[in-house]
Amino acid sequence: MTEQSNRVFLLSLGCSKNTVDSERLMAQAEAAGVVFTESASDAETIIINTCGFIADAKEESINETLAAITEKESGRVRKIFVMGCLPELYRSELQTELPEVDGFFGTRELPAILTAIGARYRSELHLHRSLTAPGHTSFLKISEGCSRSCSFCSIPRIRGPYISQPLDQLLREARLLQEKGVQELNIIAQDITLYGVDLYGRQMLNDLLLRLSDMAFHWIRLLYAYPLNFPLEVIETMSQRGNICNYLDLPLQHCNDRILRSMNRGITKEGELALIEAIRQKNPDIRLRTTMIAGYPGETRQEFEELLEFAATVRFDRLGCFSYCHEEFSPAFALEDSVPEEEKQSRTAELMELQEGISEEKNKRLEGREIAVCIDRIEENTAWGRTEWDAPEVDNECSLEGAGHTIAPGSFCLARIDGSSPYELFGTVLKVPE
C-alpha cells in the first residue's frame, strides 16, 4: 500500500466499551504502519464503529455512514468500512441498502477489519491500545458480552455471552495503560458484578480491585454494576483503599415489582432498597449513580409515580433516565409498546426534574468544602475537572476560573467549592501539584 492509502479516519460512536474496541483496532493498525487522521478530509479510508443499542444511536450511525458515502462519491475518500454493533444486527440489510460501503464487520471481527485496511492482527499486541484524549483517564473492560436476559436489551444478541477476561491479563493491560500516563482507571463491562464467575467459579471483582489498587492508580472507579448479587465486599474494600473512588454506578432501571419481573431483572424493589441500605451502611461516603427507564410497556401512571417516590426517597447522587425504546431484537419487543412517545418523554422529563432538585441540594452542601479535583481540560483561563464522585462524560463538572495557566490536564489539585448548580461546581484552586 502507498502511504496515502494507509491514512484512516476512525469515528467511534456509542459507549465506552466501543471506545476500547476502537483503541484496540488503532494499536494493531498503527503497528502495521497505518496512520490515523484527525478528520475524514485527510484520509483515504473511513471506518465507523457504530452503536446499535437504541433508535437514536442507530440513526446517528446511519447518518454518519451516509455522510461518509458522500465523501466517497465526491472522490475525497476511496473506501468505507462499518464495524461494531449495527452490523451485528442488520448486516444483510445494510449490505443491500448501502452498497457503497466496502465492508461490514461485527463486534468480534477485529482480524478481518485489520486485513481490510492492509494490516495484520498480531496476538502479541492484543492488550495494546492507542488512547483517545484525554490520556489521563481511561477504561478497563473486564469482560465481553452479557449473559443476563433483561427484556429491554439487545446487548446479548449484539455482543454474545458473558466472557470474563483473565485477571493476570487485565493487570498487564492496566500496567500498559499506566505506562501511557493513565491515572484514573474506570472499570467497565456490560456487567461488572459477574466478573470471574465463568472463569474461576466465583465472583472476582474484589480480587481484581485489590490488585489494581496496589498498582497506585490515583483513582479507580466502578461502572455498570448489576444489582443482583452485587458483592458487598467491594464496598468494604472501597472504604479501606484511598485510591478507589467512593462511587458506584448501579443501574436499577425501575423499582415496581411487576415491571422488574417483566424486565427479567431478577430483583425486587425490596431487594433494591436492601442493597442500597447495605452499601450506604458499609460506606457512608459513597455516591450512587443509577439509570432508570420511563415508559416501559404497560407502565401505568401509578407505577411511574411509584418510581418517582422511590427516587425521591432514595435520593440518588446521580441519576439518568431514558425513555423506553422498543428494540426489535430485545425480548420486550413481543410486548405492546403501549405508552405513547409523548408520555414517555413527559415522564422522563418529570423524573429528571425531580433529580435536578436533589442534585442541586446535594451540590449546595459541598460549598465551602475542600475537595480533590482531577483536571480534564483547559478552556482559556478556566480549568475544568471532576471530583472522585463524578465519572467522565456523564456526571458533574467542576470549573476553576483563573486556574487555566497554573495547572495542566491530568493534574489533581485541591480546590475549595465556592458555588454550585444542579450539575456543576464552581471552585478556587488551593493547592497545585508540585
UniProtKB/Swiss-Prot annotation:
Free-text cofactor note: Binds 2 [4Fe-4S] clusters. One cluster is coordinated with 3 cysteines and an exchangeable S-adenosyl-L-methionine.
Which cofactor(s) does the record list?
[4Fe-4S] cluster
Which terms in the Gene Ontology molecular function aspect does this entry carry? Answer: 4 iron, 4 sulfur cluster binding; aspartic acid methylthiotransferase activity; metal ion binding; protein methylthiotransferase activity
Q: Which UniProt keywords apply?
A: 4Fe-4S, Cytoplasm, Iron, Iron-sulfur, Metal-binding, S-adenosyl-L-methionine, Transferase
Reactions performed catalytically: L-aspartate(89)-[ribosomal protein uS12]-hydrogen + (sulfur carrier)-SH + AH2 + 2 S-adenosyl-L-methionine = 3-methylsulfanyl-L-aspartate(89)-[ribosomal protein uS12]-hydrogen + (sulfur carrier)-H + 5'-deoxyadenosine + L-methionine + A + S-adenosyl-L-homocysteine + 2 H(+)
Taking every annotated instance into account, which residue ranges of this chain make up the domain Radical SAM core?
A: 132-361
GO CC, alphabetical: cytosol
GO biological process terms, alphabetically, are:
tRNA modification
Q: Which CDD domains match?
A: Radical_SAM (cd01335)
What positions does the domain TRAM occupy?
364-431
| Chain residues that bind [4Fe-4S] cluster 2 | 146, 150, 153
* Predominant location: cytoplasm
Location(s), subcellular: Cytoplasm
Q: Which residues take part in binding [4Fe-4S] cluster 1?
A: 15, 51, 85
Which NCBIfam families is this protein grouped with?
30S ribosomal protein S12 methylthiotransferase RimO, MiaB/RimO family radical SAM methylthiotransferase
Its biological purpose is as follows: Catalyzes the methylthiolation of an aspartic acid residue of ribosomal protein uS12.
The record's family statement is: Belongs to the methylthiotransferase family. RimO subfamily.
Q: What is this protein called?
A: Ribosomal protein uS12 methylthiotransferase RimO
Q: Which organism is it from?
A: Chlorobium phaeovibrioides (strain DSM 265 / 1930) (Prosthecochloris vibrioformis (strain DSM 265))
